[in-house]
Every structure is written in structure tokens, then in C-alpha cells.
């Protein structure tokens, strides 16, 4: 790779590290092209991406974020899974690594924080942003539904009383 190509790749990686909610670092040695394609499809479905990176460029792109721990993640054949959603990439990579032992999760960089493999596994168990939004909307709507029911209850009871008097008078 010539100098211009390296600088373009470096700028691309800087953009990835700045724009990602989480960057999961993996060893991918032994994965076939078909398995890599399947992994990329799984990640893409969740809005995440998978990219093989040069360790030296990744370390420079990190620019000291996460200190030595983050730098230590980039050794050997490394690829990154990243997404704006802090949970999506971790969840998809963890799911794939359970099915295929050739993909080994080393750790992750999440903002200034560096996670180990167990941290990534714990992150993968959290609900995604969309699931959290759904739960929040459900929590917000539940009291509103109850309030509407309480407000309607006296009116419906009054209507039943009037209806009962009307049917009593008719009889």
C-alpha cells in the first residue's frame, strides 16, 4: 500500500473510531470466505459493519484513546466489528462467535473505555436501542391508558345508570 493509500485508510479508520458506539476487536484466522460473508450479512442486518484492519494503522487511528489496553487489542490477524448502536455489533459478533469458534472476540473500545471479552459478552446481553425505545414507549403509554380508563369509567357508569332508568321507565 502506498503512502496515499495508507493516509486514506487511516482517515477512514479515524472516522470509524469516532462515529462508532462500539468497536469490537476480533481474531478471524481460519474463517472461510463464506463464513466471513455470513458474518458480514449478520452484522449488516443489525446496522453494523465488519472490516479487516492493519494493526499499525488501527493503533495510529485510535490516537491514544483507551491507553495501552486499547493498543494491546491490535495484535495478530485482527478485524473490527463496529456500529453506531453500542450493542448491535457486540450482539452480532457474540452470536456468531458462539456458532463458529474460529472468530475469537478479543475485546472492544467503547468511547474512552476498553472492554475485555467478558465485557463484550455482557454488552451483547443488553437490549438494543430499538428494544429500549419500545420498552420506554410501553412504560409511557401504560399510565396514559390507565388514566384514560379512569376518566372514562364515571362517564360509562353514568350512561349505564341512565340506560337502566330508561329501560325501567319503558317497562
From Swiss-Prot:
Task: Report a single Gene Ontology molecular function.
Answer: structural constituent of ribosome
**Pfam family of this protein, just one?**
Ribosomal_L10
Q: Which UniProt keywords apply?
A: Ribonucleoprotein, Ribosomal protein, RNA-binding, rRNA-binding
Q: Name one GO biological process term.
A: translation
Q: Which GO terms describe its cellular component?
A: large ribosomal subunit
Q: Which InterPro entries match?
A: Ribosomal_uL10, Ribosomal_uL10-like_sf, Ribosomal_uL10_bac, Ribosomal_uL10_bac_type, Ribosomal_uL10_CS_bac
Highest taxon listed in the record's lineage = Bacteria
**Is Ribonucleoprotein given among the entry's keywords?**
yes
SUPFAM superfamilies, alphabetized: Ribosomal protein L10-like (SSF160369)
- Asked if the Swiss-Prot or TrEMBL record annotates the protein with the keyword Amino-acid biosynthesis, the reply is no
Please describe the quaternary structure of this protein.
Answer: Part of the ribosomal stalk of the 50S ribosomal subunit. The N-terminus interacts with L11 and the large rRNA to form the base of the stalk. The C-terminus forms an elongated spine to which L12 dimers bind in a sequential fashion forming a multimeric L10(L12)X complex.
Q: What does this protein do?
A: Forms part of the ribosomal stalk, playing a central role in the interaction of the ribosome with GTP-bound translation factors.
Q: Which family does it belong to?
A: Belongs to the universal ribosomal protein uL10 family.
Q: What is this protein called?
A: Large ribosomal subunit protein uL10
Which source organism? Hyphomonas neptunium (strain ATCC 15444)
Amino acid at each position: 500500500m502506498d503512502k496515499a493509500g495508507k493516509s486514506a485508510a487511516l482517515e477512514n479508520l479515524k472516522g470509524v473510531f469516532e462515529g462508532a458506539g462500539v468497536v469490537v476487536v476480533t481474531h478471524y484466522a481460519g474463517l472461510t470466505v463464506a463464513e466471513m460473508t455470513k458474518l458480514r450479512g449478520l452484522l449488516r442486518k443489525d446496522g453494523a459493519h465488519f472490516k479487516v484492519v492493519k494493526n499499525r494503522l488501527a493503533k495510529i487511528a485510535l490516537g491514544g484513546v483507551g491507553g495501552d489496553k486499547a493498543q494491546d487489542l491490535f495484535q495478530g490477524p485482527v478485524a473490527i466489528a463496529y456500529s453506531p448502536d453500542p450493542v448491535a455489533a457486540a450482539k452480532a459478533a457474540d452470536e456468531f462467535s458462539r456458532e463458529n469458534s474460529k472468530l475469537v472476540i478479543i475485546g472492544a473500545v467503547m468511547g474512552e473505555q476498553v472492554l475485555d471479552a467478558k465485557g463484550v459478552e455482557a454488552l451483547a446481553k443488553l437490549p438494543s436501542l430499538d428494544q429500549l425505545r419500545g420498552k420506554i414507549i410501553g412504560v409511557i403509554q401504560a399510565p396514559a391508558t390507565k388514566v384514560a380508563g379512569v376518566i372514562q369509567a364515571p362517564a360509562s357508569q353514568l350512561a349505564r345508570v341512565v340506560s337502566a332508568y330508561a329501560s325501567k321507565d319503558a317497562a
